Amino acid sequence: MPKMKTKSSAKKRFKITASGKVKVAAAGKRHGMIKRSNKFIRDARGTMVLSEQDAKKVIQHYLPNGL
């Protein structure tokens, strides 16, 4: 059976750290930022780490060979 391919869309959205955690950009900042608080805008600027359960699903289904 051939190797499972990595999803191209997932390659652009997720990064796997050396310790195996999955980093992703914060969501909800495409439009409508005028009504958001400054704290929300500041916090959404960076990246966040997925929970272990979500990271396991992402790696298993979308990034089987890593990046």
From Swiss-Prot:
Cross-referenced Gene3D superfamilies: 4.10.410.60
Sorted keywords for this record are:
Ribonucleoprotein, Ribosomal protein
Check the record and name the InterPro entries matching this protein: Ribosomal_bL35, Ribosomal_bL35-like, Ribosomal_bL35_CS, Ribosomal_bL35_sf
One GO term in the molecular function aspect is:
structural constituent of ribosome
Q: Gene Ontology terms, cellular component aspect?
A: cytosolic large ribosomal subunit
**Biological process according to GO:** translation
Q: Does the keyword ATP-binding apply?
A: no
Q: From which domain of life does this come?
A: Bacteria
PANTHER family (alphabetical): 54S RIBOSOMAL PROTEIN BL35M, LARGE RIBOSOMAL SUBUNIT PROTEIN BL35M
The family classification in the record reads: Belongs to the bacterial ribosomal protein bL35 family.
Protein name as annotated = Large ribosomal subunit protein bL35
